[in-house]
Design a protein with these regions (language model features):
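S-adenosylmethionine
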Residues: 1-451
Length: 451
């Protein structure tokens, strides 16, 4: 007789600690870490919800939490052991923002985890800091804007001081504040329906039958915002390729490029393939799309997504898109260059980016973007259309790149466009503001090559 021993399932707080350690100390991505943990452990619904809330909540409030830790600690926050810093942040987040959780549970669980992951001295330190907070919890008021405007905003919006300063200087305080507020909203799930498998109207009825409330995205006929019932959506719909989870802003570049059936299209920086498959669906799976990316494992992901969605016109291959490819000069009717960027438009979805970027990091992106755009221009047929896009709001990676390119390439001209709810482009360029679109920040430019 054999006995099978089930793998013990750690608590939501223990798993949140593990996830946050990987994100904050090992540069993992929160969404990928959470997907892995949720796939590995059969958590009850309430535990899965708490895990997700703790991970994203701590990341969204990290500046505020570290500031409080600094007020309570006899050591400088940066010198604290990472385990201590993360455990204190998890506990303080619960004590400050999850009032449904008893204070004793928040404190005792962190002390229990500390005993497993660090030495006794740190355990005592964690316990002492948390008990100290409970005694003083009503005394932690943020400094006012009159006292220190930059510190206030960095703590209130939970953004790095350099980013607060740069964007307030660039756009004015009111506009920057609106963008920072939008970044701290929990994003709604948005999906793109696959019309190759089912007409959009039929899919909309199917959502309703399943008790899933969805609202059409005005500028995207195949796009929907899931208002409620999102948990019921992660099943057959996705596995069968009936729909794809994608941010609304991310769907705009392909929409603007508007590839047609029978055309030849290049997606230069294609992984994970969301825009590639979107274009194939727009083309009715007729024509040809070459999809490039630098890394073979990402190419495998593009192929996997294409197969799942029933797409046969995508030809994906590993390429360094900065290297000249004379064999494909003037081959394509349309080219999409969704360029690598600083990612400063997607801070609501990829919360951790705000804690990884520094002002000096931003200089590395424009040279790469310029090189890629120069190559993209060579691959486009005369009379063809090129779309350049990024998921950042940094002007040096957006308007400046396109404006310089147009000055150097008189054979290219901007093509203006308009999208319902997002407004009209100016000189072929449109910034999608997260506070206006209720989606990620994006930049899209549409350029035509003369005959």
């Amino acid at each position: 007789m054999t006995h099978s021993t089930a793998k013990p399932v750690p608590s939501a707080r223990r798993l949140a600690y593990q996830a946050l350690y990987d994100v904050l100390e090992k540069d993992a991505y929160s969404n990928i870490v959470l997907q892995r943990i949720l796939a590995e452990y059969p958590l009850k619904a309430e535990e899965a919800h708490l895990l997700t809330e703790l991970v994203y909540g701590v990341l969204r409030k990290y500046n505020h939490l570290l500031w409080i830790i600094g007020k309570l600690s006899t050591q400088k926050v940066k010198k604290l052991h990472p385990s201590v810093r993360i455990l204190l942040a998890i506990s303080l987040y619960q004590l400050l923002f999850l009032t449904r959780i008893p204070a004793s549970a928040a404190v005792n669980e962190s002390v229990k985890i500390a005993k497993k992951v660090t030495h006794p001295g740190n355990v005592r330190f964690v316990n002492g800091v948390l008990r100290n907070f409970l005694r003083k919890k009503d005394s932690f008021q943020l400094p006012s804007r009159e006292e220190d405007a930059l510190l206030h905003d960095a703590l209130f919006y939970n953004q790095p001081r350099w980013l607060i300063e740069d964007w307030q200087n660039a756009w004015g305080v009111e506009k920057a504040d609106a963008v920072f507020s939008a970044f701290n909203e929990i994003p709604s799930m948005t999906i793109r329906v696959n019309p190759l498998k089912q007409p959009v109207a039929d899919f909309e009825r199917l959502l309703s039958e399943k008790g899933i409330e969805a609202a059409p995205i005005p500028y995207l006929p195949e796009g929907f915002t899931i208002k409620s019932g999102a948990n019921r959506f992660f099943g057959a719909f996705l596995k069968e390729g009936l729909a794809y989870v994608q941010s609304a802003s991310s769907m705009v570049p392909a929409k603007v490029l508007s590839p047609k059936a029978g055309e030849t299209v290049l997606d230069m920086c294609a992984a994970p393939g969301s825009k590639t498959t979107q274009m194939a669906e727009m083309m009715g799976n007729e024509g040809s799309i070459d999809a490039w990316d630098l890394y073979p494992h990402k190419i495998a992901l593009i192929k996997k997504n294409a197969k799942k969605e029933g797409i046969t016109i995508i030809h994906a291959g590993a390429r360094d898109a900065t290297k000249p490819m004379p064999a494909v000069h003037e081959k394509y009717d349309k080219v999409l260059l969704d360029a690598p960027c600083s990612g400063l438009g997607v801070l609501s979805h990829k919360v951790e980016i705000r804690w990884r970027r520094a002002r000096e990091d931003l200089v590395e992106f424009p040279p790469l973007q310029k090189a890629l755009l120069e190559e993209a221009a060579k691959y486009l047929k005369k009379g063809g259309t090129l779309v350049y896009s990024t998921c950042t709001l940094n002007e040096a990676e957006n308007e400046n790149i396109v404006s310089e390119f147009l000055r150097n390439h008189p054979e290219f001209t901007p093509i203006d466009f308009q999208l319902e709810g997002l407004g009209a482009s100016e000189k072929g360029m449109l910034t999608i503001w997260p506070d206006r679109a209720q989606s990620d920040g994006f930049f899209v430019a549409k350029l035509g090559k003369s005959d």
